[in-house]
Amino acid sequence: MATTARRIWRAVVAERSMAPTLEPGDTLLLLPAGPHGLPWLRGAPRVGSIVVAEREGRLDVKRVAAWPVDTLQTPDALWLLGDNAAASNDSRHGGPVPLNALRGILLFRTGPSGRRGRVS
């Protein structure tokens, strides 16, 4: 993964936690979000968005499953899940992720197999 900046940044998927949506080797273009991001992206992203968050000293790619106001008791936190539950260390194991851990929102994906475009 890459480090964040105040412009579009790039990261490469290293694990299968988001398969089949994202595969190892896919390159992601991300908009900076969270406290380090663009002013209009500092709040919680939409449910269903794919985001990068910093957890336990590493950057993880996950999908937003719930906002703080949806079903969580923890304000200012997101419930993040991997699409591949069997290979994902996500909120099912570690609980909600603080909004200030958010680093980016997926804008575009390119892949070694020619897969490219927006991801939903």
What are these regions (language model features)?
Residues 1-120:
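Extended hydrophobic leader/signal-anchor segments used for secretion and membrane insertion
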